[in-house]
Amino acid sequence: MQIYKVGGAVRDRLLGQPVTDIDWVVVGASTEDMLIKGYRPVGTDFPVFLHPLTNEEYALARTERKSGVGYGGFVFHASPEVTLEQDLIRRDLTINAMAEDKDGNLTDPYNGQKDLQARILRHVSPAFAEDPLRVLRVARFAARYAGYGFTIAPETLGLMRQLSASGELKALTAERSWKEISRALMEEQPQVFIQVLHDCGALKELMPEVEALFGVPQPAAHHPEIDTGVHVLSVLEQSARHKHPLTVRWACLLHDLGKGLTPEAEWPRHIAHEHTGLRLIKAVNERFRVPRDCQELALLVGQYHTHGHRALELKPSTLLELLQSFDVYRRPQRFEEFIAACEMDARGRHGFEQRSYPQADYLRGAAEAARAVSVQPLLEQGLKGKELGDALKNERLKALKTYKTSTV
């Protein structure tokens, strides 16, 4: 039995990055051998075990053969006869197909170290094209390592285009797709993930609503970048630079989907795109079974982001409706995330990246003014039910009128 550290742990060590997760592969062992040594089986599709002391995952060396469509269309074979090289060749990229023994000796049969030094993301073998999930994985790695100067090898990008055109991306489950998308959006340069999917034709298959934004013009006075797709990439880039959470990044990606529905005759204006885009945002959310907090914020940002930009011009009654739509009294964090998405939208325009966004503090102040209204005096007057609700709304409206007068 020989045990090797494989994949990301080896790659990250060679890159000088912190190693967080460690994967191990075991060569020359059977399931019975692992059980005798106290390892606990956890794998369902292939033999994976937890170390009895560290709880790290140890997988038996295995081969795989394509047997159907999609990510799950494979037959796996694990036995003591499977070599380390056979196990490594089934991996996606050469930089992920290296192994280290307990003494730190490197096994690198597919030149992963060379590609690491050359900053190239290259597939290990033609079998890459058998797994559609790898299109998303490579795009995610491109987003992760763009800051290090990594690019995708032309031949690998060619296979990604081939996979995208094959229709196999549609066989990916919502869960697997969202796992990759959500991880990619939390990388340092998530806009690279979307750009790569666009370049290889995968965005058209996975999120045609986002793909439709490329080539759609906006007024140059407000959007020097003009292209709506380019704008969305810039907004996403800003959301990562400001370290915003997944909810905000997802909302940034989807906020302008309605512009893809604007008739060409109306370009570059996009009247009511906030409302026309809602059904598209809902469709994307449902397609990937997106978590509820991400769904809700994306819909709210899509509907109200122009309210955010015009915050200082809004009538107090409109401002009150906005605050109530976000339930700022019970969910203040969601309104804060809305403000963040609006600010990223404003900064995601070429030449506006460093421009101040006074609407942010104004909206925060408005929320604070409305929240400061106490219901207690109204209760002491004996009000209840609809009468109480109407009275509380009127008091909040008064507070917002006072706030607007003293601020704007």
Swiss-Prot record:
It catalyses: a tRNA precursor + 2 CTP + ATP = a tRNA with a 3' CCA end + 3 diphosphate; a tRNA with a 3' CCA end + 2 CTP + ATP = a tRNA with a 3' CCACCA end + 3 diphosphate. SUPFAM superfamilies: Nucleotidyltransferase, Poly A polymerase C-terminal region-like. Magnesium is required for nucleotidyltransferase activity. Nickel for phosphatase activity. The keyword Ribosomal protein does not apply. Pfam families: HD (PF01966), PolyA_pol (PF01743), PolyA_pol_RNAbd (PF12627). GO terms for molecular function: ATP binding; CCA tRNA nucleotidyltransferase activity; cyclic-nucleotide phosphodiesterase activity; magnesium ion binding; phosphatase activity; tRNA binding. It comes from the Bacteria. Mg(2+) binds at residues 21, 23. CTP binds at residues 8, 11, 91, 137, 140. Its EC number is 2.7.7.72, 3.1.3.-, 3.1.4.-. ATP binds at residues 8, 11, 91, 137, 140. PANTHER family: MULTIFUNCTIONAL CCA PROTEIN (PTHR47545:SF1). Monomer. Can also form homodimers and oligomers. Catalyzes the addition and repair of the essential 3'-terminal CCA sequence in tRNAs without using a nucleic acid template. Adds these three nucleotides in the order of C, C, and A to the tRNA nucleotide-73, using CTP and ATP as substrates and producing inorganic pyrophosphate. tRNA 3'-terminal CCA addition is required both for tRNA processing and repair. Also involved in tRNA surveillance by mediating tandem CCA addition to generate a CCACCA at the 3' terminus of unstable tRNAs. While stable tRNAs receive only 3'-terminal CCA, unstable tRNAs are marked with CCACCA and rapidly degraded. This is Multifunctional CCA protein. It comes from Pseudomonas syringae pv. syringae (strain B728a).
